[in-house]
From Swiss-Prot:
The keyword Aminoacyl-tRNA synthetase does not apply. It is an enzyme of class 3 (hydrolase). Coiled coil: none annotated. This is GDSL esterase/lipase At2g30220.
Amino acid sequence: MYISKTIVFGLFVATLLVSCNADANTTQPLFPAILIFGDSTADTGNNNYYSQAVFKANHLPYGVDLPGHEANGRFSNGKLISDVISTKLNIKEFVPPFLQPNISDQDIVTGVCFASAGAGYDDETSLSSKAIPVSQQPSMFKNYIARLKGIVGDKKAMEIINNALVVISAGPNDFILNFYDIPIRRLEYPTIYGYQDFVLKRLDGFVRELYSLGCRNILVGGLPPMGCLPIQLTAKLRTILGICVEQENKDSILYNQKLVKKLPEIQASLPGSKFLYANVYDPVMDMIRNPSKYGFKETKKGCCGTGYLETSFLCTSLSKTCPNHSDHLFWDSIHPSEAAYKYLGNFIDAQIQEWLKT
């Protein structure tokens, strides 16, 4: 009888411990929803449903490493950084594009993407790419709010938006398309300094509009080392030596410094807001300088085609791809691979965790 009681007691304790451990491992989302704005680094497929858009990733080899091995509009071989962040925060594994026709109510409640490949803060940027400019993405957001209210009611909808994490990833297109490679804006802004200030002013107006619509927790991505993008090595005839365009990297650093200074100023003027600068420059540069640390063998060209020019409609199912997708920093001549996005996502997640402590 004594043995029987001991066994029963032991089973009870074991069951209790398993139950406690299960509860401990069930992490609640840190934010009720995630809302994504920006360009192709964040577009999870909106351009698929926007007929005017020039840049689309609705064909292989884009998406080749996603479940089902099918392209769905993401400019990479797999997940984007927004998907990685959403997963790390326990919100959901994939953030759907708002323009997707069959988007579910549950996806509306937990957040969607409004980004458009080819977009920038400067409306001029979208003229050639026919993308949805960052300045027009709040129009989609307003439609989203209306649908969200129809699902959960006005009060709950605003509660979700107030507490959601807003992620903004844009900027490189403005400088690459309008200042470096097609210098349209140089006529009005002869120096990079003036154009940087113009772009930041546009960013300022954009985040203030999001705030007026209820957004409070806003993460703003800085610029990567633009001079190291394969497309820029091609544009500046650096492909043979593989040397980054140092001046463009210096421009990225200066812009980021200005952004770091500006965000606290914006936050101070918007009661209840909380801004986070997402540093992408340093981790990407570290991947370039220390590739073996991340398992990369190639950091100067993309996996698709030659790696120096192909992107969007130039990177197709007819393009040869590198044998090992995960050993390339870049998937095409502009966009990082899923492997790189995972490292970046982990880096930014650590920033978010520290941000939440403040």
